[in-house]
């Protein structure tokens, strides 16, 4: 398959012309949604200069993305024509395979509480059709009134001759009601897509804000530089400092403030009790340590084996650092100095092998990573909260999973379900390493290798 460059977002995965312009499947789907729902977006920039539209940040400014679609040559009339053809097929042949694929409700899927108990499941052949694909749309037609039930509520006046013949033709009535039901399901499905894209935008924005604050805290950049572009990663290679076990602190008080700001905007966070908020906050702090360093390592060193910590330090992993039998190497001031080096470096090596390398192979986009991080936090806490908190966790992880399917399709993966499956399965990797990391830190504090009152307070929590 010949691939070109998308004229909208510069993605290298433009395989065809969509609505009159060479574009990737993601931008084509965005244009279709925007025109079909007659959406009007507000520019996130200054309103004078167009925002940058890049395939790594498609969710940033939808106003400028839509303008760029139209500038590239996409035509709204082609979207309308496509919808009319679908509607005609629905009228003339209820059994048309294309009509059913477009409008029919998806097969029943596991509910929010058992997504992860029954995952993965087998997808039907048509399940991943991206225009629109079944996993994106809830079963919209469940509550639509059936034709027989509807006829009980329709009272045709005695002077039926005064009405057009169309209302005396039951087949035509059935056909028109079918068309209305299908159109209703289509519009409702598009509205649900829009809600889920908004959720993806929220989590992505929170990660970008966290990155901006880290850039201010841990680099020598000018303050104005944080507004140059959305902060996909807080560091460049020039910003990094070599990992030093003597000065290394996993987090300081500013870091915990950043995490609190990050988690405060999670949907339904305010509905949790005080103790449940504390649990979610502690978990977010632990997950942030593991996942953000894996993402930074992937972005800054995509082809090199280098671990980048959340506070902007780097540790080469090829060859692996030697930690055993180094006490008499002459590089350490005391036994305590060596013990600190051994514990911290061993922990970083394990995190590299168990988390960073698997994450690097997944090569997640910013939107995928943002959803993955939030999903890990919510899912981890599902087993730790009370009944109401569990219900909130269940709703949020269900929403994130469906949003992840939508994003994987939007980014042009051949199989959104397989891609989302790979990302969701990595949640278990992160959860397992959280336990290992906490165990290492307990050893550090027990032996007074690291005197950190904030860390000791965090470790009172049973992860």
UniProtKB/Swiss-Prot annotation:
Glycoprotein is among the record's keywords: no
DNA-binding region: 3-81
Sequence segments annotated as region (Disordered): 83-119
GO CC aspect terms: nucleus
A molecular function (GO) term: DNA-binding transcription factor activity
UniProt zinc finger (NR C4-type) residues: 6-27, 43-64
InterPro entries xrefs: HNF4-like_DBD, NHR-like_dom_sf, Nucl_hrmn_rcpt_lig-bd, Znf_hrmn_rcpt, Znf_NHR/GATA
Cellular compartment(s): Nucleus
Keywords assigned by UniProt, alphabetized: DNA-binding, Metal-binding, Nucleus, Receptor, Transcription, Transcription regulation, Zinc, Zinc-finger
Gene3D superfamilies per record: Erythroid Transcription Factor GATA-1, subunit A, Retinoid X Receptor
Entry's family note: Belongs to the nuclear hormone receptor family.
Task of the protein: Orphan nuclear receptor.
Protein name in UniProt: Nuclear hormone receptor family member nhr-79
